[in-house]
Swiss-Prot record:
Key words of the record: Cytoplasm, Starch biosynthesis
Major site of localization recorded for this protein: cytoplasm
Gene induction: Down-regulated by cold. Up-regulated by treatment with 5-aza-2'-deoxycytidine. Up-regulated during the dark phase of the diurnal cycle. Regulated by the transcription factor WRKY46 and up-regulated by light.
Keyword Cytoplasm: yes
Organism: Arabidopsis thaliana
Additional remark text: The expression of QQS varies considerably among natural accessions as well as within populations directly sampled from the wild. This variation correlates negatively with the DNA methylation level of repeated sequences located within the 5'end of the gene.
Tissue expression per record: Expressed in hypocotyls, leaves, vasculature, hydathodes, trichomes, pedicels, sepals, filaments, mature pollen, stigma papillae, styles, siliques, root and shoot tips, but not in shoot meristem, petals or root epidermis.
Record function comment: Involved in regulating carbon and nitrogen allocation to starch and protein.
A GO CC term assigned to this protein in UniProt: nucleus
Protein name: Protein QUA-QUINE STARCH
Disruption phenotype: No visible phenotype, but increased leaf starch content and decreased protein content. Increased accumulation of SAQR.
Cell compartment(s), UniProt: Cytoplasm
Amino acid sequence: MKTNREQEIYVERSFKPNNSTIQNLMDIERFILPHTSTSGVARLKMRVISWVGLQFYNY
């Protein structure tokens, strides 16, 4: 089990939010939308948003 700081460092290295990341999320959303039910998209969107939000909240 990693300590909180080790976890943060791992997250920082593996995921740096920036404009291209946001753009990728939008592209993924656009690709997924036609292929899934609305509830599936909403669930996925909430999961991504809450995960990204948590990363910022931890700093």
